[in-house]
C-alpha cells in the first residue's frame, strides 16, 4: 500500500530498491532508447566515414578523368595540327613540282632551239668547207 501511495505521488522503487522519480519500465525503455541512439550515432558516423571515402575516391577519379580528357584533347589537337602541316607541306611540294615541270619544259624548248642552231651551224660549216 505504501508503494501504491508513492507511485501515485510519482515516486517508484527500482530493482535495487532505490527510490526513483521515473517508473522502472519507463527508465528501462529510456536506457534502451539511449543505447539504440548511441548505436545509431555510431552507425551514422561509420556511414559518414564510408561516404567520405567514396566521395574522395570519386573526386580522385574525376580529377584523373579530367586529366585524361585534357590529354586526349591535346593529342587530338596535335594530330589536327600535324595533318594541317602535312597538307601545307603537300601543297608546297605540288607547287614545287609544277615549277620544276615548267622549268623542264623551258629547258626542253631551249635544248630543241640549241639543237636547231647546232644543225644550222653544222650545215653552214659543211657548206663553207665544200666551197673551199
Swiss-Prot record:
Keywords: Cell projection, Cilium biogenesis/degradation, Coiled coil, Cytoplasm, Cytoplasmic vesicle, Cytoskeleton, Differentiation, Golgi apparatus, Spermatogenesis. It comes from the Eukaryota. GO terms for biological process: cell differentiation; cell projection organization; regulation of platelet-derived growth factor receptor-alpha signaling pathway; spermatogenesis. One of its GO terms (cellular component) is cytoplasm. It is found in: Golgi apparatus, cis-Golgi network; Cytoplasm, Cytoskeleton, Microtubule organizing center, Centrosome, Centriole; Cell projection, Cilium; Golgi apparatus. Residues 87-114 form a coiled coil. Involved in ciliary process assembly. May play a role in the trafficking of ciliary membrane proteins from the Golgi complex to the cilium. Regulates the platelet-derived growth factor receptor-alpha (PDGFRA) signaling pathway. Plays an important role in spermatogenesis, particularly spermiogenesis, when germ cells form flagella. This is Intraflagellar transport protein 20 homolog.
